[in-house]
């Protein structure tokens, strides 16, 4: 996996493209994310600035309520069997539903990098752990944390 794919700017670009730009027009518009758009559109750069202001250096609890709600909904959707744990199979399904990935081993490697010993004992990732990882994905400006792997292998948007 290319390490440049996990830098903060690329991670935020991924969030815009694969999580919020519903109609894939390259913008977050009123249809996608009404509360951020002052001119009717939110570019990736504008979204990055908003994320930087609202999320960098913050915990999940400090995120704005609408973002916390969106993250919780994302987890609920990913936990397909509703057992309160995000398993490897559910993680794989989440990853391949967003983008074509040639090698499942890349997804599996990302999942293993997310897990703590406690996660392994439990058999998956809990909602609170997912929240922590998501906060790290958006809120940590470097590429050193486990959270950078939350969405599996990322494309490089550079």
Language model features by range: what are they?
Residues 38-158:
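EF-hand and EF-hand-like Ca2+-sensor regions
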Residues 1-39:
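Eukaryote-specific detector of the first structured module of a protein
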């Amino acid at each position: 996996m290319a390490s440049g794919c996990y830098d903060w700017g690329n991670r935020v670009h991924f969030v815009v493209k694969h999580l919020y730009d519903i109609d894939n027009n390259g913008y977050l518009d009123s249809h996608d994310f009404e509360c951020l758009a002052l001119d009717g559109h939110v570019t990736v750069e504008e979204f990055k600035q908003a994320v930087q202001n609202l999320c960098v250096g913050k915990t999940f609890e400090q995120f704005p309520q609408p973002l916390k709600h969106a993250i919780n909904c994302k987890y609920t959707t990913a936990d397909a069997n509703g057992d309160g744990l995000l398993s490897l199979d559910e993680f794989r399904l989440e990853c391949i539903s967003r983008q074509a990935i040639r090698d499942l081993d890349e997804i599996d490697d990302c999942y293993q990098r997310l897990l703590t010993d406690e996660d392994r004992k439990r058999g998956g990732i809990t909602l609170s752990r997912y929240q922590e990882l998501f906060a790290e994905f958006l809120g940590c400006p470097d590429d050193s944390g486990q959270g950078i792997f939350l969405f599996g292998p990322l494309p490089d948007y550079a």
